[in-house]
């Protein structure tokens, strides 16, 4: 790791930084292909005020980041944030970058009426992610079942 300070910031509309982050996610999460939606779709996603994209940079290199969604409540006037993906290049892991990304999101949340942040992770073959989240200062861990209704792509969805 070079001696550059780690800079953490929102991407806003920087599509190049977003592509760099997606490339990191692709390698870390072993996506089948490094293939993404077209540029117009990704720009529209970045313009969505409920979609948050935060990157960590060392010098000019994107070394990690996270994507998250703001979810507004209908029970009270607060919101939650769901962390969709979080990843740091392998050579920068275990150096506080992931924790700094979480802390950046926490500070943003405190000043934007966000009541909580939550994230989920696969329980099988995902020991590193589980260990990482357990090292952060979370308030609770809940076992949750997820049910997915596949509507596009493989298989036929049955009517309920």
Predicted region positions:
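A short beta-loop-alpha structural element at the N-terminal edge
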Residues: 3-21
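Active-site rim helix/loop that mediates acceptor-substrate recognition in acyltransferases
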Residues: 32-53
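Conserved beta-strand in the GNAT
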Residues: 55, 61-70, 82, 87
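Conserved acetyl-CoA-binding loop-helix of GNAT-fold acetyltransferases
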Residues: 94-107, 135
């Amino acid at each position: 790791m070079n001696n550059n300070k780690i800079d953490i910031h929102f991407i806003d509309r920087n599509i190049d930084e977003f592509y760099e982050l997606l490339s990191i996610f692709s390698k870390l999460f072993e996506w089948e292909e490094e293939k993404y939606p077209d540029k117009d779709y990704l720009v529209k996603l970045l313009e969505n005020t409920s979609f948050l994209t935060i990157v960590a940079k060392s010098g000019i290199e994107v070394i990690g980041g996270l994507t998250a969604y703001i979810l507004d409540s209908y029970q009270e006037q607060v919101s939650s944030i769901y962390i969709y993906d979080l990843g740091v290049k392998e050579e920068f892991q275990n150096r506080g970058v992931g924790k700094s990304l979480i802390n950046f999101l926490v500070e943003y949340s405190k000043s934007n009426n966000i009541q909580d942040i939550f994230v989920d992770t696969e329980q099988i073959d995902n020991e590193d992610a589980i260990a990482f989240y357990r090292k952060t200062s979370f308030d609770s861990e809940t076992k949750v079942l997820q049910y997915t209704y596949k509507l596009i792509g493989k298989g036929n969805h049955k009517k309920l």
